[in-house]
Amino acid sequence: MPIALVRHAGTLFGANRFRATGLRAAGLKTGGHLLASLAGAIGAMAPALAQAAATYVPMKPMPGKGQPVPGGYTFQDQYSPIGQEALRMHDYVLLPVITAIVLLVLILLIVVMARFNRRANPVPSRTSHNTVIEVVWTLAPVLILLAIVVPSIRLLAHQYQPAPKGALTVKVTGYQWYWGYTYPDNGGFEVISNMLEPAEAVRRGEQPQLGADNRMVVPAGVPIRLQTTGADVIHSFAVPSLWFKLDAVPGRINEKVLMINKPGVYYGQCSELCGARHGYMPIAVEAVPLPVFEAWVKSQGGTPASLPTPAV
């Protein structure tokens, strides 16, 4: 009898332990499903959360970035693919060619002055021609021009390529003496941009005559189809650090692609004499991450458009 009781107790204990293990396994399995469901829900909500978290706050300009600097003697740093290509051509093609020509001409002048003056050469040479020299000074300029022309044509072709599919359209209108930025792909709203008073520009950390009350806000890393026109006289939309310049002519739409590699504030000015206050038409282009741009569009009463993934 005691042996039977012990066996019965062991059986009950084993069954209860198995039941408890099964309950724990079921609990873990249920918890795993809950965690997986929660993770999936968070993953699905991530874009919406990111969009909700993205808010537009005017970016502070960085000293020396996208604007002129005191004592500057060369091009501004470039923040567009076209600008970087042009800067490479200037640094690695034009400057070496110019330096070589200047040094060659200088050396030849020194040699001629030293060897063929009246004291060193009292009897002048009566040589009428030199075939080798004539061939050299004919072929050398041709080769030099080819070395300059080929990359120049490629650079010009890249500057005027048509806008790719999905590019954001921004229409720039030049007025006397301010700018208007219209966003047709985002509902067609227009932003009017005037120069800040010098004291207000300094307070915001911007250079006088460059700061604007409203900037042209665009997404960084996304191709921009920039269209320009003039409402009254001819203006010119120019931003040196983006290697961008396009005339704004009344009654005509000019178009060019703009691509900005990095977020930041980039300054320019009207580059076509347009009247008494021509010198007071600053341009401030602010490139921001795509979610921030979409938040800015909503703050202007516009609708975000479907854009390609930024290349930044």
Question: Model features per residue range: what roles?
Answer:
Residues 1-54:
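N-terminal secretory/membrane targeting signals
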Residues 27-39, 91-95, 134-138:
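Alpha-helical transmembrane segments and their helix-start/interface "positive-inside/aromatic belt" motifs
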Residues 52-93, 115-312:
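Non-transmembrane, membrane-proximal soluble domains of secreted or membrane proteins
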Residues 98:
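Active-site-proximal cofactor/substrate-binding loop regions of enzyme domains
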Residues 102-116:
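Alpha-helical transmembrane segments
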